[in-house]
Amino acid sequence: MHEAKSKLNEILSSSSYRNLEKHIKNGSIFNIIGEFAEEKSATAIIMGTHGAKGMQKIFGSFAMKVIISTSTPFMVVQKDSEIKKVNRICINIKSSAESMQITRLASYLAKTYHGKIHIIAEKSFDKSKAVKIKNNMVLLSKHLNKIEVDYKLELLDNNNDWGQTVLKYGRENSMDLYAYSYDSDRFLASNDKF
């Protein structure tokens, strides 16, 4: 605990932000992070990760286990990620209501940093799914109009790997941030990848 306090004091003293609080909690990261965020009504949790290593590739990454322990939105940042601006945010909308969970945080960031949200969805030939996607896109666009956030709507063809399609769109449009809502119905959700 003493080492954690010393490290935290060192980080806070080197920060230019003055309205920071420090809290050190003892417990398992798989429970305590989410519990603390909910106790403090946190808007988001920002967590660094090194990626899955060794047996984590089989049993699930630590980051994924922490993420599924709470309903608080997460921002996962990997080592050497440099975030200087948040001008373009990519939101991937699906037919499920769960895919809309991240929109509150993303729209808050876009409003705060005067950014633009790119709302993308997969073109669907399933009529029921297409209607749900359209309804989610309309709902989100109404919200963004109301809070005066610039946005762009785009339906994309899926070329077999939707994740790669999203990343390609992000590269082509110079995205600064991806807002992705995660919901798993798998028994071992900690094995999921994002």
Model-found features: residue ranges?
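Acidic (E/D-rich), amphipathic helical modules within compact regulatory domains
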Residues: A42-I58
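Structural beta-alpha unit
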Residues: E10-I45, K146-F194
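Intrinsically disordered or low-complexity boundary/linker segments at protein termini
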Residues: A44, T49, A63-S107, T112
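Structured loop/turn residues at secondary-structure junctions
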Residues: K25, H50-G51, K94-S95, N158
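Small/aliphatic-rich secondary-structure junction motif
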Residues: M1, R88-L153, M175
